[in-house]
């Protein structure tokens, strides 16, 4: 169809609005934050995909002060921020170098940083100016670290 902007889609949080997804999918992504069921927030995050295949799970401790990679701990700048490692995992499975990536809910910019690391062409949108500025500062800091070496 000529009105499509992408060949495939990955939509985080789609379990909250599944009736609005265009069709059923067998290939969901599950982000297991490796936290206790006693926490007040979700233990897992789910993404609907348009991809062919089976459900896949990414395990990575992501709980406020506790993170999988404490040596390279990420500063939290967004309420629904996901770890860069999650996007590294997604891109390693579903993208190839030079592929175009569109993120319509840029948030903290983790997807943007991962796209840069994985040599992907990236376009991102964020409606909230403060969130956009915060992720842009985070991204510029990441890129400046690359030029040091």
Task: Give the ranges of each region predicted by the language model.
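Class I S-adenosyl-L-methionine
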Residues: 3-149
